[in-house]
């Protein structure tokens, strides 16, 4: 099964997440199929907090990929 989820990056106490399409069995930060965007929860100033390639996200959703709860919330906030 394919899932769209967040993969953590960044430094200690400075999280930065990549929105990735991955096999459900792979590790959180492990191998992924495609990167769809990023989420920066502590963006400051002129930094972009969220970027998603919605065209590719819609493709993966049409192929049966299941978004995690947090990614589904991010999709809603990005499209609004």
Swiss-Prot record:
SUPFAM superfamilies for this protein: Ribosomal protein S16
Keywords: Ribonucleoprotein, Ribosomal protein
Domain of life: Bacteria
Pfam family, one: Ribosomal_S16
GO molecular function: structural constituent of ribosome
Cellular-component GO terms for this entry: cytoplasm; small ribosomal subunit
GO biological process, one term: translation
InterPro entries registered for this protein in UniProt: Ribosomal_bS16, Ribosomal_bS16_CS, Ribosomal_bS16_dom_sf
Similarity comment: family membership: Belongs to the bacterial ribosomal protein bS16 family.
Protein name in the entry: Small ribosomal subunit protein bS16
Organism: Nitrosococcus oceani (strain ATCC 19707 / BCRC 17464 / JCM 30415 / NCIMB 11848 / C-107)
């Amino acid at each position: 099964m394919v899932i769209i989820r967040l993969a953590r990056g960044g430094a200690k106490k400075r999280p930065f997440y990549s929105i990735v399409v991955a096999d459900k069995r792979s590790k959180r930060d492990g191998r992924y199929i495609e990167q769809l965007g990023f989420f920066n929860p502590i963006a400051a100033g002129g930094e972009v907090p969220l970027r998603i390639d919605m065209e590719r996200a819609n493709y993966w959703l049409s192929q049966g990929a299941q978004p995690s709860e947090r990614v589904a919330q991010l999709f809603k906030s990005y499209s609004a």
